[in-house]
Amino acid sequence: MMPGAPSPSAPSIALNDENTMPVLGMGVAGLSDDETERAVSAALEIGCRLIDTAAAYGNEAAVGRALAASGIPRAELFVTTKVATADHGFTASREACKASLDRLGLDYVDLYLIHWPAPAVGKYVDAFGGLIQARGEGFTRSIGVSNFTEEHVSNVIDLTFVTPAVNQVELHPLLNQDELRKANAQHNVVTQSYTPLALGQLADNPTVTSIAGEYGKTPTQVLLRWNLQLGNAVIFGSSNAEHIVTNLDVFEFELASQHMDAINGLNDGTRLREDPMTFAGV
């Protein structure tokens, strides 16, 4: 373990299927194979145990190589991947899960998500049926969705009679997803945030930097802590080992209510990723 690194493993959050998931982990979107292997290896050495990938990222095999090389027992790891829109459908989504397992070199993943609802395609409910089948066959421990609106989540529950364990969505102070978080909570669905650092757009924000100064923390740590204190699970992206150490070191302080409120006040609905209502998916 690197000097000064936090102790292994973030706290865990309970899912609605009796499984648990670390509240904080690292994603590998946009990373090349080499970058992925280095980042995942560094994250695991530092103590991170949740790694988030997707078929659409094209780097599942690189994640698998880093996992295998780590020597960490499989039971201590939490691996998430996602089905691409091209594989929406009952049979196709189940088969896509098996293909992801082959690329990852794993017998199962801990969480399998529908990457995008792609409502214009109209197959996300069928795709979730395939995820239910994959879970039943032991290909994945938990199943969930990503980028789903309240309407999409409700449709899945109403039509399959199964509630997703997780809804992973873009969530940061500029887009705090208050209504969606409440809706997820009503369904006992964990909200998991991605793009929590708003692509660096808040690194120099006066509100954030001022609060960071009061706690002796970095703006990044404050943004991650804010997200966690909302009750969310969080996925950050980084290929820098030093940044990964800093990002994981957010459990030894707590933001006061006035500072939470100040950061909440930055919400203006700015979406930095695609709109789930119109995006055709990946």
Curated annotation (Swiss-Prot):
The yes or no answer to whether the keyword Oxidoreductase is present is: yes
Active site located where? Answer: Y57 (proton donor)
Where is the chain membrane-spanning? none
**EC annotation from Swiss-Prot or TrEMBL:** 1.1.1.-
What keywords is this UniProt entry annotated with?
A: NADP, Oxidoreductase
Would the keyword DNA-binding be found if you checked this record's keyword annotation?
Answer: no
Q: A single GO molecular function, which one?
A: aldo-keto reductase (NADPH) activity
InterPro entries annotated for this entry?
Answer: AKR, Aldo/ket_reductase_CS, NADP_OxRdtase_dom, NADP_OxRdtase_dom_sf
Q: Where does NADPH bind?
A: L197, I235, S238, T246, N247, R273
Q: Which Pfam families match?
A: Aldo_ket_red (PF00248)
Q: Per its UniProt entry, which superkingdom is the organism in?
A: Bacteria
Give the family, as the similarity comment puts it. Answer: Belongs to the aldo/keto reductase family.
Protein name per the record:
Aldo-keto reductase MUL_1987
Q: Which organism is it from?
A: Mycobacterium ulcerans (strain Agy99)
